[in-house]
Amino acid sequence: MITYAKAGVNRKLREKIKMRKFLIEENDIIVTYSDNDIGQAKKYLKVMKIYNSEKNISQMTRNIGVPRRTFYYWIKGTAPKPINCLKWLKHYHLVPFKKFDLNNYCHRILFDIYAFMFGDGSLDKTYIELSGERKNLRAIETKIHKFFPNISTNIFKTAERACSLFIYSAYLARFLIALGCPIGDKQSKEYSIPVWVIKDKRLAKRWLETFLGNEGVKIREKRRIARIEQYKLIDLENNALLFLNQIKQMLKKFNIKNNISSSRVTYTRKKDNKKIKGYYLKISRDKLNIYRLLNTLKYRYAQHKQIENDKTLRYLRKDLISHNNRFKAYNIAQYLKKNNYRKSQVKKIYNTLRLFKKGIPWKTFYSGYFLKSFTPRYYQRRDEIKKFNLKTK
């Protein structure tokens, strides 16, 4: 289902889209233009259809309601904006557009830009803006020029470490609008993630990786805090919660536990004195949950965050390997205890075992044999840890 950012696209049309084979058809691009531009496009198509068979040009232009000057512009090749947009998109096989194929490199970069629009991106009818670090934005710019060589781009420095990439393409902007990207200020707009993203696991993963690169915080070793913050007008609270619940649903596909909360404090925006509120998606700090997050999803286009995340991932992997070794030591000790091995034999068996299986801790081995109530930490979740396929010593 496509959710339109532009008001005026009625519910019946959106219901019809559910049954279609294509995400974007010609009409989806046309309806992103003004009524005047749409009217001109309709007249243009009528003129082009009957021009060659019509002998009386004056009569034809009067009947259709087109000035003679406009008619001659059209004949010479200057078409209305919607028609030019469709020609450009058809040239690059973006209309009709069936789906994003992540095996296609062009589709891949377009989908990343699409995901940016829900995070550190901004969309206007004439340009696209992406925010981030210069190195990451330069990589996107290079790919844009590779697939769309005639598009102009520019990178401006906006803060000490932050830059903005401007992509000056009204046609590509219309393509994103037709896909349902929010236009302008996201705090005061209603929008949601389309069903076709949520249902496709590969698209959901790619979308999350780009969005987390934009909005996620870097996850440090000890605190393991991972969350997403969204600020919205109080009047749009339901939409903010819907959006975060959709992200929650996608994270659930990868067994990543999270919960949603909202701030009790409201803030007043300086530009219009409207009240806004913070909404948060907090990912559980549980060690296994954070490992699963970092092992499954990479933060795209956020190199400084990913470096920190990789450190945390290495730390957690090392820690979980230690837990695995404790489980082994405990299981062996329990086996010896069950089979009535004498205490004098336990130390000898441990020393022999240590030669073949490195990393088996004596403390856990000893406690597993001598202490009745002892169980290693996370032992009840050993099957869950086993699924990570950690390389143990």
What do the PLM-derived regions correspond to, one by one?
Residues 1-393:
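Internal intein/HINT superfamily modules and their associated LAGLIDADG
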